[in-house]
């Protein structure tokens, strides 16, 4: 179980408190009156900041062994993009949670490989998504459709740093 709260910053008073059936395992992203989080079952949730009620959720494929690496979420316009513990990158409509695109980055038939997968945080560079993993893969994806722009053989799961024309 995972408990989450809204607390008044000035008084410390709990405004509301809710429970999720599975522990959260991601960054938390906030936009407007909503916040987004992924649990250990690879389900992304959209909650209301006002009262903590679930607005929508979307379940991606899961594996019985849970990752310790925090999953990553980025927001771009009306899209929320995130990774799951088996290497899939998914883009959803931020308002209703409907699928826009999804791309696997691993051969999910080989479960032994996904057990040890560790992915960097996703980096939003305008129309690109940049990320890497510990399986010798460094990606640039097209944010609009999920297509692979390029893939390099670089072994790193540290968050990439993107400048105007260079990635570190």
Where are these regions (language model features)?
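Repeat-solenoid scaffold signature
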Residues: 79-80, 87
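Extracytoplasmic beta-rich repeat domains
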Residues: 1, 13-32, 53-77, 98-126, ...
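Short loop/turn segments that connect beta-strands within beta-propeller blades
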Residues: 8-12, 48-52, 94-97, 142-145
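Residue-level marker for isolated small/hydroxyl-bearing positions within beta-strands
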Residues: 38, 82-83, 132
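Surface-exposed loop/turn positions within WD40 beta-propeller blades
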Residues: 1-2, 41, 86, 135
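Structural recognition of beta-strand segments within beta-rich domains
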Residues: 133, 139-141
């Amino acid at each position: 179980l995972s408990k989450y709260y809204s607390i008044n910053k000035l008084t410390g008073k709990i405004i509301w408190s809710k429970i999720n059936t599975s522990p959260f395992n991601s960054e938390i992203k906030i936009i407007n009156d909503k916040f987004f989080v992924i649990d250990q079952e690879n389900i992304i949730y959209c909650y209301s900041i006002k009262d903590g009620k679930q607005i929508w959720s979307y379940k991606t494929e899961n594996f019985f062994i849970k990752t310790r690496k925090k999953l990553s979420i980025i927001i771009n316009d009306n899209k929320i993009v995130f990774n799951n513990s088996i290497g899939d990158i998914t883009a959803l409509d931020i308002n209703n949670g409907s699928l826009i695109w999804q791309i696997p980055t691993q051969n999910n038939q080989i479960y032994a490989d996904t057990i040890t997968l560790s992915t960097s945080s996703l980096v939003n560079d305008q129309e690109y998504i940049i990320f890497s993993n510990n399986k010798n893969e460094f990606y640039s994806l097209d944010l609009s459709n999920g297509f692979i722009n390029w893939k390099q053989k670089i072994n790193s799961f540290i968050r990439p740093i993107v400048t105007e024309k260079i990635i570190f």
